[in-house]
Amino acid sequence: MSADALLPLLKSTFGFDHFRGRQSEVVDRVMAGERTLAVMPTGAGKSLTYQLPAVALNGCVVVVSPLIALMHDQLRGARAAGIRAASLTSVDADWAETRQAYRDGQLDLLYVAPERATGEGFRSLLEAQTPALFAIDEAHCVSEWGHDFRPDYRLLRPLLDAFPEVPRLALTATADKHTREDILVQLGIPGDGLILAGFDRPNIRYAVRPRISPAKQLVDFIAANPGPGIVYAPTRNGTERLAEQIAAATGRSVAAYHAGLDPERRARVQHDFVASEDGIVTATVAFGMGIDKPDVRFVAHAGLPKSIESYYQETGRAGRDGDPAEAMMLWGADDFARARMRLSELPEARVAGERVRLNALAALVETVECRRALLLRHFGENPPERCGNCDNCLEPGRQVDATVLAQKLLSAVYRTGQSFGAGHIEAVLCGRSDERIASRGHDKLSVFGIVAGEEARLIKPLVRSLMAREALDTTEHGGLMLGPAARAMMKGETAVLMAEPPVKRTQREGGRTSRADRAAANPVGDPLFDALRAMRRELAAEAGVPPYVIFHDAVLRTMASQRPATRSALADIPGVGGKKLEAWGDAFLNVIRQF
């Protein structure tokens, strides 16, 4: 059965008239019994490529997923669409009931964690009733090349090979060329089984800023972005501190999330965020991977992510519903200093690969070109030179040649003994003497007072730039020291080009999303839209599910604009499937009739 033959089922189950992107190709291969690796951007509808076959195929689709919270979120969504779904996790109390339902053929979907899937007991269960499909979600976890390697994923192959006739579908949003090749090998998928749907998330606006006053920068960014959001901080203390500062400045609901909280508290923060329409979580990177929340409107990083892959995945948690979303990163020279210190602690075999990842991040934060283009080229794509939806495209900066200034700065670091901070070096270069400088004789050095005028404004940004380029590093006490790339710069063998810092950055930290775009995404002030959202909240509370499980905002916007008066008219709206129409259609029609 082809994907096209499943279009009526797609409409009746999920409320969609057609497939998106390359969904139909993936479904075609699944229905033909092929083995497939689908690399699709977050928000492109990866889960539909196994949920629709789960309804169409005879037998149960077994989904391997790494996070319990993610499984349970997807479970709620599947059940709301009328799919018979269950999970076997450490927090599920109904194991016996679920296993019996599987044996009796009463399940369409069974979610399981990799550590459960690789146990002998689970294989015995599958031998009693052969599954219709293995779907391996977050498949990059199987690869040591990937940014989130999990050893349990490596143990899946024997289970898959025990059922060679069962098709395999591996899914990921984040895999560079090396990782993709490794996934194919590790999961026994042929090279022609790769479907690469691309990595672009055109609805996300990317911005990168030097970290100057992080709390204020984040507050300004959040003030311009209504709706739910995630702020990533490098440390547990940072999440707590930012939560307090953002809540005090904005009056919004903000909760911290990190591994130091007890499990009950973490579960509560996650539950409240998923159910909210405007909540904010400040978190370490542990948060978000287990979240299936499509209406996150922004993601901010208060520090440097671990890698380009991590950045792509974390920012990809915004705008999964297709509406406009924002991603902003704040970075500082100390981020690179800490990252390089961590490099020195790694096994030798991993250092080269991690250095490549760090240098890719340096290129992202340093570039004056299109950030989206750089990001997509990292994943092997050939994007246009300009995207029109990142800070560098919207607010182009001038590139300046800072080669000579870099030589002066590096010379000052060297001549002062490679142990003083950026403020001290700046004072020496600009000829500002004080007791500390005079007592060390630094006012007598040849580099004292050799920088003036416009050059002086570039010193601090240049320190950040040289840290990112490995020309500067820091001592254990925070002083500046020369890095491995310094020698070539000091000899004039390497040119140093950098973005000229703006005289005054607009208060809007995330770019310039048009008011029209934002109003279209979230038309607050439309009485009917507000009433439909209120009804959604009420129904979600009754059903014990997050509001987006009822209907996405896009569906409510279409209801508000089209004002359907009958069930059949409501069923024509994309996203209104048969089960949801039956369960909640009349409630929304009653709201519409009041306007």
Regions found by a protein language model. Name each.
Residues 2-13, 17-21, 25-47, 55-57, ...:
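Helicase motor core with emphasis on the C-terminal RecA-like subdomain
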Residues 30, 222, 273, 365, ...:
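Short helix-to-turn junction characteristic of helix-turn-helix DNA-binding domains
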